[in-house]
A protein has these predicted regions:
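A hydrophobic alpha-helical transmembrane-helix feature that marks the membrane cores
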Residues: 1-188
Length: 188
């Protein structure tokens, strides 16, 4: 099934477009969505991401995938805990990380044309750094937003923050994993 899905560029493009569309839909309508609907859309997104990421098992050696996953899990857990426990104000990081992410996207698209292994390596290193920062920033921001909603007694906001927070941290985790895998990866 995996070979059939990924042998068609149209299907791959459709999977990626569906993921992007769901992220944009969830982000744009979070204030209006019922929490159950938001979590349902997040679940659909996670399933689509799982199908898309399954290609790594055909490209990378299993040991490399395990190494990248272990490194990702350790880094992600450490940065999430740091974000939840730090007393420092991280709000200034938000715009810097967002601008860096836009630059990363531009560089990634440019490398589709240049096919430069050096640029691919630089993009991967930058991606790890950016998503480490986003993990720290998002963890802190989700904690602060949740605390504010709890103080206000807004249970609906707490549920919505939980759904969008899950999506943000999931995206941070997956992207961190993909960039770490790209750095340590031994292709078959």
């Amino acid at each position: 099934i995996q070979a059939a899905v990924f042998s068609s560029g149209v299907i791959v493009f459709g999977l990626i477009a569906a993921q992007l569309g769901l992220v944009l839909l969830i982000s744009a309508t979070m204030d209006k969505l019922a929490p159950a609907m938001a979590l349902g859309l997040f679940s659909v997104y996670a399933a689509l991401m799982g199908v898309t990421l399954s290609v790594i098992f055909g490209v990378y050696e299993l040991g490399t995938i395990g190494l990248a996953f272990g490194a990702t899990a350790s880094i992600f857990a450490g940065l999430s805990i740091a974000g939840l426990t730090t007393k420092k104000d991280l709000t200034r990081l938000g715009p810097i990380l967002f601008a860096s992410l836009l630059g990363l996207i531009v560089a990634s698209f440019a490398n589709l044309f240049f096919q430069s292994s050096a640029l691919e390596w630089l993009v991967s290193i930058a991606g790890v750094i950016i998503f480490m920062g986003l993990t720290l920033y998002d963890s802190k921001k989700i904690k602060e937003m949740t605390a504010k909603a709890v103080v206000q007694g807004d249970n609906l906001a707490v549920s919505r923050i939980g759904a969008i927070g899950a999506l943000k941290l999931y995206l941070d985790l997956i992207n961190l994993f993909v960039f770490i895998l790209s750095i340590v990866g031994h292709r078959k």
